[in-house]
């Protein structure tokens, strides 16, 4: 049995992991999906005081309160920032860190600094114009979703706290590198806003020593929300990675 903690990306909530969580539990694993402050069923808490540190604490507290060790921490999209921070602060509690089409920051980077200037300026302008200092979700079609999946995600998405977008993340890459890491690269279609990250983790020219060189890359032929568009394939991948973690 493996212990999974699943963390959603921007505009989502624990709801997006529903099918994966159910499948992991049926397979005999323990699975806990986190909803970050200000989004999902916690959208009523959205406000300008939510920071990157708030969300890092959300994940750490979930691990602590569930009394989990040997955690397979799967982080989606924006939550790559959070997974990196958790690996830095409590590497001994993690068995594997799985970046699901996620941000893989360098020390001192913010999430916004991995984006093109037009994307960055648009989101920051939207946040500045919002009383809650947040920016709205995109149409789910950008995640490669169609039909019922598209409509479900469109109904469920909520604005994302803007200060989490701007804040740089300081961490020790040597400490994070103690944790086995895998990047799941979703390729059909690839999300343009993580092109920088995709290149960073798949092209050895951009590796920063052991920090990225020690990472494994797995491809899934689905869009940016694989927990929705390909839940069984993602579940199988996570179970395989948990098996690897058990033998390291």
PLM feature segments, named:
Residues 36-72, 88-89, 113-117:
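Active-site loop/oxyanion-hole signature of alpha/beta-hydrolase fold enzymes
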Residues 155-175:
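Active-site nucleophile elbow and catalytic-triad environment of alpha/beta-hydrolase enzymes
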Residues 187-221, 225-228, 233, 240-241:
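Conserved loop-alpha-helix segment in the C-terminal half of the alpha/beta-hydrolase fold
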Residues 88, 92-94, 98-139, 164-165, ...:
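Flexible "cap/lid" loop of the alpha/beta hydrolase fold
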Residues 21-44:
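Conserved alpha/beta-hydrolase
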Residues 9-12, 77-78:
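Active-site glycine-rich loops that stabilize anionic/oxyanionic intermediates
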Residues 74-79, 83:
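Gly/Ala-rich beta-loop-alpha elbow adjacent to hydrolase catalytic centers
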């Amino acid at each position: 049995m493996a212990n999974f903690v699943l963390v959603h990306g921007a505009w989502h909530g624990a709801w997006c992991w529903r099918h994966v969580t159910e499948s992991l539990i049926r397979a005999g694993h323990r699975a806990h999906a986190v909803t970050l402050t200000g989004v999902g069923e916690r959208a009523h808490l959205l406000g300008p005081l939510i920071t990157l540190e708030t969300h890092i604490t959300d994940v750490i507290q979930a691990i602590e309160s569930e009394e989990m060790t040997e955690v397979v921490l799967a982080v989606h999209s924006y939550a790559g920032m959070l997974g990196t921070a958790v690996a830095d602060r409590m590497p001994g509690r993690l068995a594997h860190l799985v970046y699901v089409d996620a941000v893989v920051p360098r020390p001192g980077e913010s999430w916004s600094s991995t984006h093109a200037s037009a994307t960055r300026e648009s989101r920051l302008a939207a946040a500045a114009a919002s009383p809650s200092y947040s920016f709205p979700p995109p149409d789910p079609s950008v995640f490669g979703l169609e039909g019922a999946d598209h409509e479900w995600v469109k109904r469920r998405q909520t604005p994302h706290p803007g200060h989490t977008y701007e804040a740089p993340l300081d961490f020790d890459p040597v400490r994070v590198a103690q944790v086995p890491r895998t990047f799941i690269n979703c390729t059909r279609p690839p999300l343009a806003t993580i092109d920088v990250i995709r290149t960073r983790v798949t092209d050895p020219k951009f590796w920063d020593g052991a920090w990225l060189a020690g990472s494994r890359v797995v491809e899934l032929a689905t869009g940016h929300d694989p927990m929705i568009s390909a839940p069984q394939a993602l579940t199988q991948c996570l179970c395989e990675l948990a098996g690897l973690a058990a033998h390291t």
